[in-house]
Regions:
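N-terminal Rossmann-like NAD(P)+-binding domain of SDR-like oxidoreductases, especially those catalyzing
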Residues: 1-130
Length: 133
């Protein structure tokens, strides 16, 4: 059976990825720390739900053991908390992502899918063309 891990898998985007993976008969491990006060968490009874912060390297590596695929959706995506505590946002979004990539490499995961942000595109002139996409 294919084992897929979804970091941030109890959040909005991650939970939809989990739903699709379950329909594809993957064994899914959801990693989330339930930190965000504003999100509705979507823990499922048919997944292994692990409460881990992606900045905890040792715990993350243990949870990744045996994984075929990693879907990385965990992040501090909200603007308010990032402005209030930029060091924490940087730690989660940068060090946490480095931990995800390093653990995936060390356990021999086949692929990592990284869900970034629309902010990565920057400001573009309207209308958009295929060059901007």
């Amino acid at each position: 059976m294919t084992i897929s891990i979804v970091t941030g898998g109890a959040g909005f985007i991650g939970s939809h990825i989990v739903e699709k993976l379950k329909r594809l008969d993957h064994m899914v491990v959801v990693i989330d720390n339930e930190y965000s006060d504003n999100d509705n968490f979507h823990w499922r009874k048919d997944t292994l739900n692990v409460n881990i912060d992606i900045t905890d390297y040792k715990a993350l590596k243990k949870a990744f053991t045996g994984a075929d695929y990693i879907f990385h959706c965990a992040a501090e995506a909200r603007i308010g908390p990032a402005i209030e505590n930029p060091v924490n946002a940087l730690n989660i979004n940068t060090i946490g992502t480095c931990n995800v990539l390093q653990c995936a490499r060390e356990v021999g995961a086949k692929k990592v899918l990284y869900s970034s942000t629309s902010s990565g595109y920057g400001l573009n002139e309207a209308p958009l063309s295929l060059i901007h996409i």
